[in-house]
């Protein structure tokens, strides 16, 4: 059984027991989060596709922790003009463990 949820403007395919990293959520470590924006639920041969969400479907997850991704570098350069600019960015994330899929 798996589901497709929407979080942080992105869609994630989740399976019970799996851990995944999503955009930063305002939740404390150890707390439980319920996702109501379930776009699809697949259980064996049964497939439920929402329009836009599956009615009554929920995905629960436990917050494992928060952190930051690896640094990415943004570099601007103009050739022959001796102009170079560097910037770095580390995006925050929330790590979740999927505890249940219903629907």
From Swiss-Prot:
PANTHER family: 50S RIBOSOMAL PROTEIN L21, LARGE RIBOSOMAL SUBUNIT PROTEIN BL21M. Part of the 50S ribosomal subunit. Contacts protein L20. GO terms for molecular function: rRNA binding; structural constituent of ribosome. InterPro entries: bL21-like, bL21-like_sf, Ribosomal_bL21, Ribosomal_bL21_CS. It comes from the Bacteria. Pfam families: Ribosomal_L21p. GO terms for cellular component: cytoplasm; ribonucleoprotein complex; ribosome. Belongs to the bacterial ribosomal protein bL21 family. This is Large ribosomal subunit protein bL21. This protein binds to 23S rRNA in the presence of protein L20. One of its GO terms (biological process) is translation.
């Amino acid at each position: 059984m798996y589901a497709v949820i929407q979080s942080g403007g992105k869609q994630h395919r989740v399976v019970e027991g799996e851990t995944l990293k999503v955009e930063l959520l305002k939740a404390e470590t150890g707390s439980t989060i319920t996702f109501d924006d379930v776009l699809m639920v697949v259980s064996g041969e049964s497939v439920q596709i929402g329009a836009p969400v599956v009615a009554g479907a929920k995905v629960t997850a436990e917050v494992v922790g928060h952190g930051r991704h690896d640094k990415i570098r943004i570099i601007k350069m103009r050739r022959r003009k001796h102009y170079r600019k560097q910037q770095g960015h580390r995006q925050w994330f929330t790590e979740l463990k999927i505890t249940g899929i219903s629907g």
